[in-house]
């Protein structure tokens, strides 16, 4: 079986990707209209958008690496109750 063409991939997945992109745009609009201090999760999303716009291959790996904790030593005590999806010191 051969790999699908770009047109075939677009035919299958474009509308889903379009909806997700519009969802993200609406989310960022809401964040930008909101009061309060900066949030590491929003910084992480904005960094990911830069990765997407650069057009390099392996975008998923690059974004996940950006969002990951680069330290090698475990913390004595966590400063959050749960994972947030983006390293807080990003």
Go through each PLM region and give its residues.
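Surface-exposed peri-terminal alpha-helical interaction modules
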Residues: 2-90
